Every structure is written in C-alpha cells, then in structure tokens.
Amino acid sequence: MATYSFYVNGREVTTEENKSLLRFLRDDLHLTSVKDGCSEGACGTCTVVIDGIATKGCVMTTKLAQGKQILTVEGLTHEEQEAFVYAFGAVGAVQCGFCIPGMVMSGAALVRQNPNPTEEEVRWAIRGNVCRCTGYKKIIEGIQLAAAVLRGEKQIDEDLERGDDYGVGKRAFRVDVRRKVLGYGKYPDDLDERDFPDMAYASAVRSKYPRARVLKIDASKAEALPGVLGVLTAKDVPVNQVGHLIQDWDVFIAEGDITRFVGDAICLVVAEDTKTLERAKRLVRVDYEPLEPVRNIAEAKAPDAPIIHKSFNAFGNLVELHDNVCQSRHVTRGNAKEALAHSAHVVTHTFETPFTEHAFLEPECAVAIPYKDGVKIFSTDQGAYDTRKEVAHMFGWDKTPERVVVQTMLVGGGFGGKEDVSAQHLAALAAYRFKRAIKCRFTRQESIDFHPKRHAMLGTFTLGCDENGKFTGLDCEINFDTGAYASLCGPVLERACTHAVGPYTYQNTDIRGYGYYTNNPPAGAFRGFGVCQSEFALECLIDLLADEVGISPWEIRYRNAIEPGEALPNGQIADCSTALKETLLAVKDVYEKNADHAGLACAMKNSGVGVGLPDAGRANIRVEGGRAVIYSATSDIGQGCNTIFQQDVAEATGLPKSAIENGECSTEAAPDSGTTSGSRQTVITGEAVRGAAFLLRDAMLAVERGQEVPATPVCAHGDGATIEYDDDTPYVDNHPGDLTAGHAVVPQDPVAALAALEGHEFRYVYFEPTDKLGADKPNPKSHVCYGYATTCVILDKDRRVSEVYAAHDSGKVVNPIAIQGQIEGGVLMSMGYALTEDFPLKDCVPQAHYGTLGLLRANQIPHIDAIYVEKEHLLPVAYGGKGIGEIATIPTAPAIQNAYHRVDGVLRTKLPLEGTPYSRKKTAGKEAEKSR
C-alpha cells in the first residue's frame, strides 16, 4: 500500500490514505485552526502555507503533498503569532473569526516573502480568502501592522490587550481575538472524539424535488450497512414540526406527504463515521410523485394555485389557511390617498429585489449528547433559548423545556441566517434516540440550499411632496416571497413596512405588506431585517422627487430629515440622541464636490424588538475566583457584544479587563437575554449588564466602607428610567453621573473590593415597554431607540464604485476599534447586494455554489470612510449606545443606484443593478479568479 509523507509544522507525518489535506489536518492531526468553510476551493478558510505559498487545503491531497513543507497557524513562530494577535486586535480585524486563521496564513506567506507589502499587495494576497464580516479593510490594515511589527518598526502595545483601562468609549481589544487568531477557539465542528469518545455522525437525506409526494422511503439497505446506527423518519419524531415563531416546518416529510422545497429532510441517517454515513445515505431509496411547484409570488397568488400549507401552529393556536398568504401587515397613519392627490409632485415605481444568501463562513453544525433526563446541544446559533424552545417542542417537552440544554459556542457569522434551527434538532433527536454523542454538520451546499435567505421583494411605491420638496405621503404595497416555510416572515415583513417611510417628517402613510408561501427555499432574517428592500425603493424615489422639485438630492433629504422632538411617520417622537441631520452634514462637502457622479441615501434602523412585544435584557454577575463573571445567554456572532459587556462592567465598577470575564453562554448557566437580532444586544442586554454592574459596584463600595454585604443574590429590574429591587424597594442612585460614560463613582481599589465579595451574585433585568403596532395613541413608542445613517457613494471614470462615505449616528461609540469594522463590513455587504450578489433559482431549485454567489473579494473593495457621529445629549440606556450591526447594510445599495442614475439618467429598479461594469461579469468570484 502506498504511503505519503510530508512535513507539517516541521514534523514529518505519514499516511496511507489519499484524502483532502484539509481533512487530514483536522481529522488526523487535530489542527483546528484549519477551518472547513466550503471544501470547494472558494472561501479560503482552510488556507495553509505549502512550500512558502498560500494554498487552500481543501484542493490539495495528501498524495500531492508528498515531500512538501506545510505550515499552519500552530506552526508560526512565536514572534509571528504575537505580531498577528496584536495587529488584528489593535485594528479590529477580528469579528466572527472563522476566516481569520486563513487570512493570517495568506498574510504570513506574503510577509515572509515581502516584509513591507503595500495595501495593493495585501489585497492581492488575500483575494482568495472571503470575509463576510469586516469588509476586508481592517484585515488589510492588520496584515500591514503585523508586518511592521515583524520588521521592528512598530512595537506591540501590551497594555492594549491587557485592558487596564477598559471602559466605555475606550479602544477595547476584543476579548476573543487571541483564540480566534491562533485558531484554538472552538466552534461546534471543532468538537471531536477527543471531547466525546463515543461520537457518531448524522446527516439528512433531502428531497430531490421542490414539490413532490413522497410515495415510499426504503432505508433497509442503509440500515443493514455495518457501522450504521439507524435511520430516523417522521414516525420517530414525537412532534414533527419546528419553527421559530410559527410551527410549520416539518422535521421530516412522511410517506404520503408533500415536500415543499428541495431542502426538506426525508430521513436522518446516523453512522459511526462520515464515510459510512455518506455511503448509507446513497443507499436510501425514496420514491416520489413530482408535482408542479409554485415558483414565485405571481403563481402563489393565482386563484388555482396549490395551497402549500393548509394550517400552521402559532403561539399555541392552530391557524387554518385558505391561500398562500403566510403573513400580512397594514401600517397606516393619516390619509395617504388624499395627501398624494394634493401633492405638487408624485412619483411611482415598482421595485424588485432578489433572494440573497448570508454566505457566513461557518456552515451549520451542532453536537448533541444525552444529558440528565434530556439532551445537551453544543450549537452555533443566534439564540440559545430559542433553540431550546424549538427542540423541546419537537420532543413534546413544551412544559419542561429545561430538559434541553443549549450551549452556544463560537459562532462563525450569522447575519440572521442562524436564527432558525438547522442541525441542532437533528443532532438532538439522534443523541436522545441512540444515547450517543452525535455531530450533525451541513456541507456548504446543504447550507446554501437549506437555510432561509433574504426575502425577495416585489413592491410598488408612490411618494409625494409639495412644491418645496417636503414629503406629503407614501403609499406602497410590499410583496415578499417567504418560500416554503414562515421562518420570521411576519417580523421581517413588519419591519419592512414600518421602515419603508424612512427617517423623515411626514404623517400620511398607507403601507400594505404580504408574505407569500412558494416552493422556493425559505426566507427569513437577514441583516437589515426587511429594511434593505423597502428603503432601497424609497431612497430611489426621493432622488426622482428632488429632480422634479429642482433641488439637490442632499437638500431634499436635509429638508425632510427627522430632528429631536419631531414625530417620525409612525408617530414616535424622535429622542434627544437623534442625529440624522448631523450624518447628512458629515457627507455634504464630499457629495457636493462629486455631485454629478455621486449617490446619496439615508436610513434608520430600530434597536430592540419593540412594537409591544416582550424584549427583556437579563444579566447576572457572579464573583468567581476573584473575577466578575458575566452570565447572559447572548450569542456573540462576531459583532463584539461580549467585549461591550465587559466594557460596561469596567465602566460601572472601575475593574480592569483582567478581573472581568464572560461566563458560559448556555440555557443552564445564564439567563435568557433574547435573540441576537434586531440590533438589540448593545442596548437591551448592555443595559442589563450595566444594571447588574451597578449592583456589584454598590456592594464593592460597601466593602470599602467596612460594611457587611449579605451573601444572598441581589436582584433588581429597571425600565431605563427607574430601578427597583425585586422586593419593590426603590433603588436610590446617589451618583447621577453614572448614566454617562466617564462619570461613574467607583471603588478606590476595585480588585480588592471584588475579592471580598467572592461567591456573591448580582442579577438584573431590563425591560422598557413599547407600544403595539397600530396603537391608538397620538405618538406611540414603537422602539426603544433608532440609529440613523447617511451614505455617499462616488463612481470613478470607469463607472465603478471608488469611494463610500458612511456616516452613522450610533449613539455613544462604546468601542471605537469595533465600530469601523462593523460599518465597513455592512457597506461591502450592501455593495454586493446592489451590484453582484444573486441567488438564482430554476423551477425553485438553487443554482448557486459558494463561488458563484457574487461575493466581493479584497481586490474589489472601494475606499470606505466610516464616520460616526456622537452627540452630547444621548439616551441614558446602555451609556447611550445604539446598535450598528444592521443599519450599516441599508443605505449603500440605494446610494449606488442613485449614483448610476446621476451618471447616465437610467433608473434601475431591480437588484442586482443592470448595466454597470459589475453586471458584465456573472459573479464577483469569477471576476476575481480571472484577474489572477
């Protein structure tokens, strides 16, 4: 038998198996820095250095590696490792972290060959590595800074990572940088037989057809295969439905039932190893009767259309359906029809936006084990308690959901795409059935085909204004294709409707929204949560009105921009922190200098769920081992909320970073603080953390005064204006400056005071009521707060996007290192949405692979200037911070369209935009490949 020998990190290794180098490094050598993002050579997360050249591990085999020198992050010199850790942390290059080891290796290969690379050389070196979080700019800066450190021109600032001064507004080195850069931080797929010696593997056989009757499932040959533990079907599931809010998603399609999309699971095969698993899946025979699918909104609305769902369960109620309308919303205020009839100028157009894929770098994965009287799931998702609820429902444990324990590990990006269960419930089902640890991991293609996308929209918008350009009214109908299952159709549709009005001052609106079931892949949450679609349409119409009035696009927005004390179109009074006009002023000069080839757009985005729904932030702080340990079941999916929570504690108590840590994010150890969605964690959970930190601070001050502090947990709650202990005793704050960063009264020796409180616990719940949609009030409060933004896009002489100026009102900037990367990443994601990204379907079947999604690469990015506006007057909640994660993705797409409209006079109402230099290429990925 042939053997293959090569060197990995200086050590000779030998194998008799010709396999992917990626799999050998991960499975045989357990080098977890080498990530499996696609296994098709498209993403770069598995990049290693082979004989000095950055190479994707998934396209190299052990046979081809014969005699070669292979280097991973683990094999870099100590000096190189420290340089990259410091540099990536100092500039904010690390968000979800899944792409980072691959980026480091591409950077290390470059720096070893060229110790002083230019920005263009770095862009070129990492063009094969995809990052979906940062927009690449911070990674480029990080590689250049690492090179400067290794040349001896820059020194590592050890104080920055140590974080002795770690409060709000300070440059905070993220808490997870080191483990993500060096690759030892664990995502679910990094769990293996070393963690669970009895681990087995599960994978679903999925439908070949978007709509077909399942006539017969024959798994007998698969079950007879040695190494197969069993094959689970619908009859093995206590409750064969899951769903985030609406339970309409079948766990498995049973014999006699009809599939709804090609991602539907027919059965789950469980085997001792992955080779046996894949062989067994091929042995499962499924007989179908193919049926005509419902391809789009028009077909879904047809009178003779097949009804995709006859009913669903929502909040414990059975809802019967008689058409394909999954959800609908009607948002109205004033009299839009009359206002438009009396307007000096009115414009109407129909807009179309596509499905788009989240393309997070980490495919879905879960590991489940039998645990106590139920199961424990190690998961990558956006809400541990949401997953617990869905999985408990599947088991029929609605009254005892604690039998399901969910622990969130590192999450390799989400952007809304990990709010629904995917692999978690399948792993749990198999673990409970076979009493074994089970790993269920999606391939990249399964991920693309299965998880919910951004909703495709078809909408008609009518906007009017008076002779001076003041908006008078908006009428629109928004139609969403929600695909085969509801996912978060209702909330996303609602947000699209409530934000379709924009951040302006007019009061006549009539907005109808409908979400239709089709046989396409489901659509659900995606960064922007429906607002990207509706504000694209609105902001394009605003430019048309400016032309009719005879004023500039900047001027018409400034005349209508919301200010503190004024009413938004939904009636909510803009609070003191509102700074939309300031964002417009921030880009005014650059826009006016380039007005004939520039585009402008504004946006607003809520923080928190709002609209009268329960949306509490919860946090506990326990003193353990001389540290303040923050417990909150909050998923940090790359946005950096764990770092922000530590900054909140540092600000309130005066503690250094070394005395603060984040505890286990699980439903067993931490309280429910809601989904990482709706730009809510900085505000909602951040305020809960701050409240708990105040309770801790008070106890620390009592220690310094020589007072005895009872060992019982201290519990309190607040609504942003008042705080009460849970026994209804009012909380008396003798330090009014506490609400403003930089003014807190803290102990003289916080570390010593903390040590005296070992074992003490401080619990806080923050809930600020909001009003329901359509509340009968003159000025209802829909959300705790809004962020605002203005983006200016400039085209070059070749009609390519050359510069983007993104000005944001994000309240208090909690971490200046993090905010720029969030804005830059959002801008680039929105640029892809506008120009290159698509998710083509043929008769409801996805045609995309990761490399054909149109994701922009590092050598295609424009200059991005992230501008943040801080006002003196801020909200008292969470030190005045607001969410930045979603709003950064909203205004860039319409600004790009408006720039092209300025240049050639063509209104483009469909995304991705046609007739641009980008549209001549089928995908950005192919363009990048061709340029090599």
Question: What residue spans do the PLM features occupy?
Answer:
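Glycine-rich loop/linker segments at domain edges
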Residues: G92, K170, D176-L182, H322-A366, ...
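Thiamine diphosphate
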Residues: G414-K435, K439-R441, I644-D648, G851
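Flexible, low-hydrophobicity surface segments
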Residues: A148-L321
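Signature of N-terminal electron-transfer/Fe-S-associated modules in redox systems
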Residues: M1-E161, V611
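C-terminal catalytic domains of large/alpha subunits in multi-subunit enzymes
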Residues: A234-K235, W397-R403, R433-I438, E467, ...
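Short beta-strand elements
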Residues: V48, R179, G185, C365-P370, ...
